[in-house]
């Protein structure tokens, strides 16, 4: 695992873009995906199943020098997909996020990582392109009805369904008020995307 910074993430995403699109098209999708996870481990515990990992103190690590390397982070959905994870949530359940919940700094850095990947791959930051593992696991775009395994079905995977923050306080996969973890993270990522774009105009 190698420590990197936000500009590195954008550069790697840009260099990986063409191959990611080609991989996606090879499995019948028209675009790459970004799947957001947590490790369900300790805050500094790294796993090489994910392209990018963010620790609880906000440090960023990559497992490979290309995001087009296929890693095993999401069941039947790894080709042409970038897996990003927060190192947190050991012992978490739907009532309590355990001994190491996501930290504020981790959430902000993670959102910047998502924004940088989407900038580099030319992906719009929305739920079609950027999903939590749980959202992907409940998606009929990717799975047959009998194979769904997210928080609205079997709950085998519910990564980042809630963040334990004011914006996303509780487990509620049916929420439509923007409080689901994926909605909050996409909102933050879009904020960073827009902030960087405005600053670039002023430079």
Where in this protein do the model-derived segments appear?
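Short, conserved "active-site rim" segments that organize catalytic pockets and cofactor/ligand binding
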Residues: 1-70
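Short, solvent-exposed loop/turn segments at the edges of secondary structure
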Residues: 29-31, 47, 77-81, 125
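Basic/polar, cationic surfaces and motifs that engage anionic cell-wall
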Residues: 1-28, 92-203
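Structural preference for beta-strand elements that scaffold enzyme active sites
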Residues: 33, 81-83, 129-131
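Peptidoglycan-targeting cell-wall enzymes and recognition modules
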Residues: 51-104
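Residue-level marker of positions within ordered structural domains that often coincide
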Residues: 41, 57, 89, 115, ...
């Amino acid at each position: 695992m190698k420590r990197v910074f936000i500009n590195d993430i954008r550069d790697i995403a840009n260099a990986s873009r063409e191959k990611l699109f080609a991989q996606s098209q090879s499995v019948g999708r028209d675009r790459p995906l970004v799947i957001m996870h947590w490790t369900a481990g300790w805050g500094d515990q790294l796993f090489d199943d994910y392209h990018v990992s963010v620790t609880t103190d906000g440090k960023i690590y990559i497992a490979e020098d290309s995001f087009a390397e296929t890693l095993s982070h999401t069941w039947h959905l790894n080709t042409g997909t970038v897996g990003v994870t927060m190192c947190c949530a050991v012992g978490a359940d739907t009532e309590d996020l355990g001994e190491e919940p996501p930290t504020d700094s981790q959430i902000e850095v993670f959102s910047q990582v998502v924004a940088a990947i989407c900038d580099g791959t030319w992906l719009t930051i929305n739920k079609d392109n950027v999903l939590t593992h749980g959202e992907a696991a409940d998606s009929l775009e990717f799975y047959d009805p009998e194979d769904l395994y997210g928080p609205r079905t079997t709950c085998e995977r519910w990564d980042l369904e809630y963040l334990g923050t004011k914006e996303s306080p509780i487990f509620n996969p049916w929420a439509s008020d923007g409080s689901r973890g994926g909605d909050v993270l996409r909102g933050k990522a879009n904020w960073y995307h827009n902030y960087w774009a405005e600053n670039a105009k002023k430079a």
